[in-house]
Amino acid sequence: EVAVNKLLEIIDNAEGKVILVGHSKNGIIVSQAAEYRSQKIEKLIYLAAYLIPNGKTQAEYSSQDTEGVLKPYVNRFPETNSHTLQPIIYKEGLYHDCDDDITDMAKCILSHESVATGITPLQLTEANYGSVPRYYIECSDDRAVTAFIQQKMYTETSCKKVYKMATSHSPFFSKPK
């Protein structure tokens, strides 16, 4: 909820409509924000992101993604209700088609994520969230959120258009153009 509220604050302070891009777990955040500010959002773009329907959780979908390589490398921190990935999996799991300097940078910038966003059911309505056009960019070589689960999500929750890129989970680093 903290992340959603921060995004809502940014949307509220923006002039005109915004385009939200959600990557990975942040698909959840942009979806919930669209429920609360649909009139301020031109479109939603999901980049290898969790596109979860009303009443469901990210955990329900990630548990079906049996080909993903990240799960054994998740460290949990109950005292802060957060988790993070072990750096040893960064290259193989997130950046396998990127230069090594990208993996080195990731070791400095990736941080803990709230567990709550993955286990809290989304509260979405057709009138609000459903009124915002959705687009999906599938990363077909993704080892974190595999093509299987990406396809399942954008098939269950329709998008105006689906684009496919033969990239890892991080095309903004491997194929920025």
Spell out what each predicted region is.
Residues 1-19, 35-36, 59-63:
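Active-site loop/oxyanion-hole signature of alpha/beta-hydrolase fold enzymes
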Residues 35, 40-41, 45-79, 83, ...:
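Flexible "cap/lid" loop of the alpha/beta hydrolase fold
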Residues 112-176:
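Conserved serine/cysteine hydrolase catalytic core
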Residues 80-128:
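Conserved alpha/beta-hydrolase catalytic His-Asp/Glu region
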Residues 21-26, 30:
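Gly/Ala-rich beta-loop-alpha elbow adjacent to hydrolase catalytic centers
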Residues 16-17, 42, 132-133:
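Short coil/turn segments at beta-strand junctions that form active-site/ligand-binding loops
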Residues 2, 6-10, 32, 89, ...:
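Alpha-helical elements of Rossmann-like donor-binding domains used by nucleotide-donor carbohydrate transfer enzymes
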